[in-house]
Amino acid sequence: MLKFIQNNREITALLAVVLLFVLPGFLDRQYLSVQTLTMVYSSAQILILLAMGATLVMLTRNIDVSVGSITGMCAVLLGMLLNAGYSLPVACVATLLLGLLAGFFNGALVAWLKIPAIVATLGTLGLYRGIMLLWTGGKWIEGLPAELKQLSAPLLLGISAIGWLTIILVAFMAWLLAKTAFGRSFYATGDNLQGARQLGVRTEAIRIVAFSLNGCMAALAGIVFASQIGFIPNQTGTGLEMKAIAACVLGGISLLGGSGAIIGAVLGAWFLTQIDSVLVLLRIPAWWNDFIAGLVLLAVLVFDGRLRCALERNLRRQKYARFMTPPPSVKPASSGKKREAA
């Protein structure tokens, strides 16, 4: 059992998601419906996209705490371009390019200037948030065109166009990380940096790519945010970076790099979003959301930590088992045989 969990760390997140879906069903049978699933998925899309980007960065043994600010900055650019009369495709492409550029800048600080990731992205968190507020003057962006909201309108099976795009991106990234040499380079870089270099992996380039794609995912999350609510507040993206990191940790992505699967991060994001829907079902006031979500997250992390210790003990036991096995005992020769030999 431990070996199975060891090879499938996202199983704990899946169990948490299933339990959080089934248990409220005993209070309200209507909760157990396809409509609930589509509603939770629609709410989870932003966090899923951010968790996917954070996964790439964390696999390389880094962390990015600026993605919330990138999301807000990119959402503001999208709104400004649309209100200036640019078409939706042009505005979306420019928004994605801005996110890519912001992520590239983060990666360059870490890979080329050797600044610790947490320090570099703490700096850019304030920088990007400041740019966002300078562009807006501290005001909200409203009056966005109706075609933007159509991106989040139900299209097929109750899922929007952006929802289907998110599913495709999850499937593609899961395949990329699991089945290609390029994807395995992220694991190698985070697991053993020097070893990866000796194997020919361009570790600096991999880290820059990870941060760049993370920024692009944050920009896409900004587009989703704007399309879902139809306006852009000046606090857009605040606090999302911590939720994205928490979703990854819940899904089995190691903070030490080199291990985890993208599906685990997606399940972690779904779990955190589903907590909010359960609290609404239980009619718990909204100001309890962060407290209860943090409490549940802490409980899951404690359980995950204890499980990790058990797995490590199991691995050590397997590794050194052959050295600890006592040698077979040799039976002493009988006294009769000794006399015959004499």
UniProtKB/Swiss-Prot annotation:
Q: Which residues cross the membrane?
A: 14-34, 39-59, 70-90, 93-113, 115-135, 155-175, 213-233, 252-272, 284-304
Intracellular or extracellular location(s) = Cell inner membrane
- In this entry, the parts of the chain located on the Periplasmic side of the membrane are 1-13, 60-69, 114, 176-212, 273-283
What is the superkingdom listed in this entry's lineage?
Bacteria
Q: Which residues lie on this side of the membrane: Cytoplasmic?
A: 35-38, 91-92, 136-154, 234-251, 305-342
Q: Which UniProt keywords apply?
A: Cell inner membrane, Cell membrane, Membrane, Transmembrane, Transmembrane helix, Transport
State the family named in the UniProt similarity comment for this chain.
Answer: Belongs to the binding-protein-dependent transport system permease family. AraH/RbsC subfamily.
Q: What is this protein called?
A: Autoinducer 2 import system permease protein LsrC
